[in-house]
Amino acid sequence: MKHLWFFLLLVAAPRWVLSQVQLQESGPGLVKPSETLSLTCTVSGGSVSSGSYYWSWIRQPPGKGLEWIGYIYYSGSTNYNPSLKSRVTISVDTSKNQFSLKLSSVTAADTAVYYCAR
């Protein structure tokens, strides 16, 4: 029982510490092939202008693992997954405390659950 409690505390503590910052994705649920997927992530309880973090987009295709799409720093500098780089744009709007993802020319291979992350 002691081991179980230790495990639970170890897992739960980081979530409690970080719970003040929340990220909420918004955008269309469906996009037609060849169109552009546009998603926005709104940050609450923190600021995208914080110089301590990179703001990321990741996705998880059905039945597969997580795939990193890219990240942006508050200054606007970006880094993208090489396999998606030609189709991806990530931008930040510090006035709205948001960052956004645009993925152009989508195909069935882009079917996934998309997440924003810090």
Swiss-Prot record:
Region Framework-3, annotated ranges: 79-116
Task: Give an example GO molecular function.
Answer: antigen binding
Q: Where is this region: Complementarity-determining-2?
A: 72-78
Q: Which organism is it from?
A: Homo sapiens
Give the region (Complementarity-determining-3) as residue ranges. Answer: 117-118
Database matches in SUPFAM superfamilies: Immunoglobulin
Q: What pairs make up the disulfide bonds?
A: 41-116
Q: Where is this region: Complementarity-determining-1?
A: 45-54
Question: Which InterPro entries does the UniProt entry name for this protein?
Answer: Ig-like_dom, Ig-like_dom_sf, Ig-like_fold, Ig_V-set, IgHV
Looking at the record, which segments are called Framework-1?
20-44
| SMART domains in the record | IGv
Q: Where is the signal peptide?
A: 1-19
- Main function: V region of the variable domain of immunoglobulin heavy chains that participates in the antigen recognition. Immunoglobulins, also known as antibodies, are membrane-bound or secreted glycoproteins produced by B lymphocytes. In the recognition phase of humoral immunity, the membrane-bound immunoglobulins serve as receptors which, upon binding of a specific antigen, trigger the clonal expansion and differentiation of B lymphocytes into immunoglobulins-secreting plasma cells.
**Location of region: Framework-2:** 55-71
Q: How does it assemble?
A: Immunoglobulins are composed of two identical heavy chains and two identical light chains; disulfide-linked.
Please state the protein's primary subcellular location. Answer: secreted
Instruction: Tell me what this protein is called.
Output: Immunoglobulin heavy variable 4-61
Q: Which GO terms describe its biological process?
A: immunoglobulin mediated immune response
Q: What's one GO-annotated cellular component?
A: plasma membrane
Question: Keywords of this protein's UniProt record, alphabetized?
Answer: Adaptive immunity, Cell membrane, Disulfide bond, Immunity, Immunoglobulin, Immunoglobulin domain, Membrane, Secreted, Signal
